[in-house]
Amino acid sequence: MITLTGYCLNTTGQDAKDSTALRPTFGATLTSDMQTDFQETRIQHLLELSAEVPLSRKLTMQVHSMSAKASNEEWLYYDMQGFSNIDCYEDVPFALTVAGLEWKINDRHTLFAGIRRTDEDYFCSDVLGMFTNSSMGIFPTLSYNYIVNTYPEAAMGVHYAYDDERWRLQASLYNGIGNHDFKGGYNVFRFCPKDDGLLLLGQVEYRWRGSSYYLGGSKHTEDEAPYTMWAYAEQKLWPNVTLLATYGHAFGKESLCDNFYGGGATMTLKNWDLAVFTDYMEVLGFGQWSTEIGIGWHVSEVLTVKPVLHIMKLDEEDTKLVGLMRVCIEL
C-alpha cells in the first residue's frame, strides 16, 4: 500500500509538470520610434506577435509574425548602417518571421525546421539589444554581401543549437535568399537551392563569470559570394558595467563591405540603462563612422522608454545628428 501510494503521488506530480510544460504561450511587443533630424520627424511602428504551442514534451510548434508601418516612406537620413533597426524599406502589413517545429532532443540539443530569421539566433545578445543601430542586429559584412534572412526577411531552413552552462554552439542552413511575401515567385515559403543557393552560418559562444565571447562565420554557395567571419566580446567589468568590442570581416574580391569594427560600453542602474557605442564600416570605398548614445528607462515590467542620439559621419560629408525616442510595450 505504501509503495502504491508513493507511486500515485509521483505520477500526480509528473502529470502536473507535464500539464504546465504543455501549456501554449503567447506574446506581443509593440515598438514605436519617433525619429527626428531636428528639422523633420518620422514615426515607425513595429508589432511583433508570437505563439509557441507544445505538441509533446519534446516537440513545439513556433509561429512568430511582424507588422511594420511608417508615417511616411521617406527616411530621414540614408546612412549606410541604418540608425533604427525597426525601419523598413516599405510597410509590411503581415509577415512570418518564425513558423516551424522545434525538437528538443535532450536538455542540451535542439533542432528547428521551418521559416526563421537569422537574428532570432545570431547577434541577439542582451548587450547588443540595448542599441538601435541596425548593425548591432547583423553586422554589415553579412547584410551587404548576402540577401540574408534578417529583419524583415525570413527563409526556409534548419537551425541546430547545443547549449550548456559554458558553451553554446549553433549551426544553420537556409535558402540563399530571404523574403517576406506570401505570393509570387519569390516568397517566404520558397526553398530553391538551385536558383537561390544556400546560406550556411555557424557560431560558438563561451560564457564565463557574466562575460560572453562569440566567434562565427558564414558562407553563401553562390560562386563569387565571400566568406565572412565575426567576433565580439561582452566583458563584464563590474556587475552593472559591460565593455563591448566587435569585428566583422568578409573575404573575397566581390565583397561589398570588407570590414566592420567598433567598441562601446553599457551600464545598468536599477531601472536605467546607459549604452554608448561607436563603429566604422566601409562599402565600396565609402566609409562611415557612427556613434550611438542611448538611455533606457524601464518604467514597468511591460513599458520601456529609450531616448537615443546618433552621430554619423560619411567621409567628406558634414556630421549628421539624428534623435530617436523609442517606446516599447511588451506583453
Residue ranges and their predicted role:
Residues 57-58, 165-169, 201, 205-284:
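Detector for outer-membrane/organellar transmembrane beta-barrel domains
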Residues 14-37, 61-63, 134, 140:
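Transmembrane beta-strand segments of Gram-negative outer membrane beta-barrel proteins
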Residues 319-331:
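Outer-membrane beta-barrel "beta-signal"
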Residues 12-13, 74-98, 108-200, 328:
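Surface-exposed coil loops of outer-membrane beta-barrel proteins
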Residues 37-45, 55-99, 104-105:
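Surface-exposed loop and membrane-interface regions of Gram-negative outer-membrane beta-barrel proteins
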Residues 26-32, 63-67, 113-117, 171-175, ...:
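Transmembrane beta-barrel strands of outer-membrane/channel proteins
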Residues 18-28, 55-63, 107-111, 165-169, ...:
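Outer-envelope beta-barrel architecture signal
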